[in-house]
A protein has these predicted regions:
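Short, compositionally biased
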Residues: 2-186, 253-255, 262-270
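C-terminal, surface-exposed recognition/capping segments
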Residues: 2-22, 195-270
Length: 270
């Protein structure tokens, strides 16, 4: 068995009090002694590597986020579907959960790549990760990094002549829906993913793309190109993931890469 399967088997052998304690430590803060045993089993499966994908939507009536499995979405009538706007895909896997935007960022003229910016600047509040640093794969601080990057570079021209932080700004300003086009303004707090979040996307790219393409064809799938993360390697390079092979590499901040924003879901839940 894999390490994760071993971990799940160990959890299943514990009594409920012990299971609750371990799951709370992992991050399932809503789990308690009153949680049904059937839900405990689902949490344990997730802790052991369960992949769960669903459509992330905004209900037009009140702006609340609602999530649908593919089966649930497909079972809705056209009239009921019209009550929701799809904004992306919620992924729950490897003890993470977040929403992946339904499309890559584009600029004002339709361009799909952005420079990272801040070339030659070591940004305060954004930790550098060198080669071989295993902590890179666990990073989940994309929103914090995005905010720090934008604050530090606002109106500042870097050593290559780039003003600001185009990739982080594109992620922050992303809108999955607008008042003008859709009748509802997207107020989701999007950000440039951490490398850990981007690696999770790469790991499950095939499954994510299957869900995306089931409703919009191939126009908005995760491509095979390089995608920026919000994690720096040093003052001149930031980490990327090459989605074709899932390679993880630092990329010069003067180069242009794709941006797929994500949004946090604060507490782990079923």
């Amino acid at each position: 068995m894999t390490d994760k399967n071993n971990e799940s088997a160990l959890l299943l052998r514990m009594n409920k009090e012990e299971q609750v304690s371990v799951l709370q430590e992992i991050g399932f803060t809503s789990v308690n002694e009153n949680t049904p045993a059937s839900d405990i089993a689902k949490y344990i499966r997730w802790a052991g590597g369960l992949l769960d994908l669903s459509f992330a939507t905004i209900r037009i009536e009140d702006g609340v986020n609602v999530f649908f499995t593919a089966e649930e979405w497909n079972s809705l009538s056209a009239n009921n579907r019209s009550k929701y706007l799809r904004i992306g895909v919620r992924i729950r896997a490897d003890r993470r959960q977040f929403v992946i935007a339904k499309s890559d960022c584009t600029d004002d003229i339709g361009g799909r790549t952005f420079k990272w910016g801040a070339y030659g600047t070591d940004i305060r509040g954004v930790k550098n990760y060198g080669n071989g640093n295993q902590g890179l794969y666990e990073t989940a601080d994309g929103k914090q990094n995005t905010d720090a990057i934008i604050e530090a570079t606002a109106g500042v021209k870097d050593n290559s002549g780039v003003v600001g932080a185009p990739a982080a700004e594109a992620a922050k300003n992303y809108k999955a829906c607008t008042l003008e086009l859709d009748g509802l303004e997207d107020k989701t707090e999007w950000y440039l993913p951490s490398e850990g979040e981007l690696i999770t996307i790469a790991k499950y790219k095939t499954e994510i793309n299957e869900l995306l393409s089931s409703v919009s064809g191939n126009q908005n799938i995760i491509t095979t190109d390089w995608y920026w993360s919000s994690i720096e390697y040093d003052s001149s390079n930031a980490w990327c993931v090459y989605m074709y092979y899932g390679y993880v590499n630092p990329y010069n901040e003067t180069y242009a890469g794709r941006v797929r924003p994500v949004s946090a879901i604060e507490s782990l839940s079923l």
